[in-house]
């Protein structure tokens, strides 16, 4: 079952779903919009392939600021301004807001697992021309779905509780 605006407001009021900070215009007809945070990680142009066991920091450049340009065909990691917490019976689908999608920006299919909490780090793929995006701009739309029963194994992975843009983590 997809949660509509009335459902979402109720879940937020009961604190079953947490979105912090929550702005008045964030709750939409069938989801919640998330805003651009103040940090981005750009993929470095390196001449060697990444292999598990290598330090992912060697492949990214982090930037902090209030506006970012996503260059043509560039892939970046962006973080949401909001911290999200989901219960064990709610998951979310992440989509690019249509205004940015119409500019050619893309996000890969992404799911937020039931039980997740943290700021979202999302890959954004650039368009055919540069696009400037400012901190605080609504850029993602989350569609929330209720599972029939609470999940047996809620998310407790390595990205649980993440804050700021989080580059890939590999464990042995």
From Swiss-Prot:
DCTP binds at residues 97-102, 113, 155, 162. Keywords: Hydrolase, Nucleotide metabolism, Nucleotide-binding. It comes from the Archaea. One of its GO terms (molecular function) is dCTP deaminase activity. Pathway: Pyrimidine metabolism; dUMP biosynthesis; dUMP from dCTP (dUTP route): step 1/2. The active site is at residue 123. InterPro entries: dCTP_deaminase, dUTPase-like_sf, dUTPase_trimeric. Belongs to the dCTP deaminase family. Homotrimer. Catalyzes the deamination of dCTP to dUTP. This is dCTP deaminase. It comes from Metallosphaera sedula (strain ATCC 51363 / DSM 5348 / JCM 9185 / NBRC 15509 / TH2).
